[in-house]
Amino acid sequence: MSLLKNVGTIGGLTAVSRVFGFVRDILVARVLGATPMGDAWQLAFMLPNIFRRLFAEGAFASAFVPLFNRRMVEGQSEAQRFAESVLSVLLPILIVFGGLAMVAMPWVVAYFAPEGLESDPEALPIAVMMARITFPYLLFMSLATLVAAVLNSLSRFAAAAAAPILLNLCLIVALIYGASLGEGVMARRESAFWQSVALSLSGLLQLVWLAFWMHRAGFRIRMVLPRISPGVKELGILIVPAVFGAGIYQISRFVDLFFLSTLEVGSYTYLAMADRWNQLPLGIIGIALGTAILPALSRYLSREENEEAQRLQSNAIELAMLLTVPAAAALFVSGSAFTRVFFAGGAFSLEDAMITGTVVSGLVIGLPAYVLIKVLTPNFFARKDTRTPVYTAAFSLVVTVGLNIALVPRLGVLALAVAGSIGAWCNVAMLYVILARRGFFRLPARIAGRIARIFVAALVMGVTLWFLMQPLDPWFGGTTLQRTGGIAAVTLTGAAVYGIAAILLGVLDRATIARLMRRQT
């Protein structure tokens, strides 16, 4: 399939999941709000997900896919033995790590808990209990990541892209039940408890779902006795630096947790809710592109088809910018409109929504950079180079932490968003310079010119939306009809202006679409 079709498959299913995710977040805002129990749930939800994205999705997939593809060239039986040996070692590690985390959870939660939660003698033990309930999600999703990596290597992208829908459905059911309990502290506590149970259950369901489709694809991974094979050793060597290279975003989240613990109650919720808007295009575009190009790059480089690898990388960057730059511009200008329309109500006040909207604007400054990291790092991983992204990630992290120290006392939670965005752009700059100096990739002047025109088209759209936001501002906090009309006007106007500007500037034409639709082999 072509890059555009693969990204469309992954991104389309991810978009469905994100829609359910927004329904989930609206319910979370209405049921829990920016309260101590809301922060407790966000912390219990963040902890296993940070480890999942850091070790399972980012590091594991980046190291596993090139090694698996190399063995697929030798034959499926060789690839199957490799996957089985990896599973035999991965499962005991996950069990031991999960057990240690369960024991240490009171100290972990107390360390990361915000001041208002830490000082609450009743809320803190509940937060610890919730975190323990949610942590098995890491075990299930790490195993699911192994199965998903196999499916993606076989170019079966749909099943893995659809799996997160199960997560959101489980949480929505739990939240609907929580909403039926009424208002008050006790109702919020019970709702948060059932959300924790639903999270772990969703991990098990996703694992079963992916295993079913792997079997349908004719691939089996059997349980065998643990054995440190040469392939497992090589995978382990690649994973350690990949944790930092592919997981810089998640490492930054640990930094965020530390600084959030120094801020007022509600800050966890503000950042989490704002990040949902940042994650929407990042998940649909960035993760889809990174997932789609890694197997293809691995195949091209194993066959020494360097020109095809260069073409694929250029197309991926152009497509990433074509989609993320306007999304970032639109959310930067109108982020507060979206947070007021979708989140304000119930336990989540209009002031909470306005603060969240400000954080959205800070986060999306780095949206194109986060996507470019997803697009550029596979070029290293496909060459089995997981060390170089370590250095760029470390530099980016130093920049982020330094900015947090300087800005958090002045800007509060907004500083975390801005610092992370600037750090991400530093990461992108270093990744590209290193690729260019090593002769692995250099962006063609033609593509660079098109990207410049993309920024111009997005700027035209952003200015238009800025003028539109002022007369529509009262609508975003008005009746349901006014909110719907206001957000529809912003969305449709932004899409129309960007589309027209892109066509007039030559960003979108038939030749570009045909090039992006070209089949990968």
Protein language model features and the residues they cover:
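Membrane-embedded alpha-helical bundles of multi-pass transporters/translocases
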Residues: 1-521
